[in-house]
Amino acid sequence: KAIRRQRQMCIRDRKWNNGWINVVNPFRASIVLGTPGSGKSFAVVNSYIKQQIEKGYAAYIYDFKFPDLSTIAYNHLLNHLEGYKVPPKFYVINFDDPSRSHRCNPLNPKFMTDISDAYESSYSIMLNLNRSWAAKQGDFFVESPTILFAAIIWFLRVYKDGRYCTFPHAVEFLNKPYEQIFPIMSSYPELENYLSPFLDAWLAGAADQLMGQIASAKIPLSRMISPALYWVMSADEFSLDINNPDEPKILCIGNNPDRQAIYGAALGLYNSRIVKIVNKKGRLKSSIIIDELPTIFIKGLDNLIATARSNKVAVLLGFQDFSQLIRDYTDKEAKVIINTVGNIFSGQVVGETAKTLSERFGKILQKRHSISINRQDVSTSISTQMDSLIPPSKISGLTQGMFVGSVADNFGERIEQKIFHCEIVVDAGKIAEEEKAYQKIPVITGFVDDDGVDHMKEMVQENYNRIKEDVKRIVADELERIASDPALKHLLELNK
C-alpha cells in the first residue's frame, strides 16, 4: 500500500491544488534532505514511522535525538496493533539509562556463521571510531587493527561455542598483553592466516611495528570502555532479526549528541548487523529508518538499497546535504546511494546539492516572450527553450514545510506526475492532541528493591567486573591448555 502525505501543489494555471504524495513503492528506498529547521522530521520522517506501523511493518529506527522518534513509535504501536498478524514487541537500546533499555548482543553467535561476519563487524566498529578511515581502505594502519579485532571476535565465537562472544568481552581480551593473546589465538587453525602478519612481526623482533599495530586498535576502542555500555551489549534479551515472521519487532536505538564519539561505534555495529540480518527472503516487510545518517557509518548501506526491494525492506535515510554523505561514505559509495534511491524529498538545500537535485528533476520546454521597442514599432517574438523544471535557486529558497522531490512508481500503479513542488500539510492541532496522550517509554529493568533503594549503579558495575573476570579466566585456562599440549606448547616459547 502507498504511504500517503497531503500536499498542495501548483501544477496548472498557476493555481495551488490539494492532493497527495503517494509513495507506492517504499521498497525502492527514500531520501529526505534539508537544512536544519526545514521540516524533515516533522513533515516526512514522523509520517513514515506512523504509516508504516499502521500498515504492519516491522521496523528499526535510529533515533539520534533519543527519545523523540522512539516515543512516537512506541505510542503509535500501542494504538495500531491491529495492523499485524503477530503483534510485534517493542525494544529499545539506550546507553544513557540502563533501566529504560533492553539488552542485546550484536555479536550473537547464532548470526556469526563465518569469519567474514567477524571482519564486517570489526570493520564497522573501526570506521565508526575513525571516520576518516573510510577513504583509506586497504592502508596498513587501517587493515591491521580491523583484522586483529576480527580475529578476536572469531576466537570468542569458536571458544566454548560462543558463550563469551560479546563486544565487551572482545574489548577486554584485546587489552590483555599480546604475549598472552597471540599464543592463544594462533593455537586455533582457523585464525592462523588472519594472524600471520602479527606473528611474522613478532618472530622477526619488530616489537615497535607490532605495538603500533596493536595500539591502533586499542586506543580508539578504549573510548568505549563503559559499565553502562558493557551492560547493554553483554546479554541477549532479544535478537536483531526484527522481521522474523514469528517474532516481529519494533526496535529503536537511541544516540546522544553529547556522547556521539563514544556511542557511535557501538550503534554502528548494531546498524551493520541489522542491515545484514534483515535483508533476506521469506521475512516480513520491514523498514529501516535512519534520521541524521552522517552521525553513524553503516557498512553495506549501498548494497542494502540496491537489493532490499526484492526482500521487502523499505529504507528511509534522512540527512542535511549530499556533501555530508560524500564526506563520510567516500565519493564512490555516496554516488551509489544517491543514484539508486527511488523516492526523494528535499526541503531547503544549497550549493551543489541544489544543482544535483535540479538536474535530477530534469528540464522542460518553456516558452519565452521577448519584446523589442524602437522608434517605428514594437515587435514581439516567441521562442522555446529547455529550462530546469525546478531551478537550483528555487530549491535554495524553499521556506519551512515546502518540499520538492520525486517518487517512483510500479507496474500497474503508474504515476504521471512524479515530480512535485509543494507544501506538505501537517495537521499540527491533531498532532498536539496525540502528544498530550503520549506515554513515556516505561522502565524496562527494575533496579529498585522493595525498600525503594536503587541498585542500578552497583549492578551495572558488577556486570562490568564479571566481564573482566571472565576474560582473565579465559586467558588463564587457554594458557594452561597450551602448556599441557605437546603440539602447542612451543607457542609459549615464542615469548622467550
Where are these regions (language model features)?
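Single conserved hydrophobic/aromatic residue that forms the stacking wall/gate
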Residues: K1-R7, I11
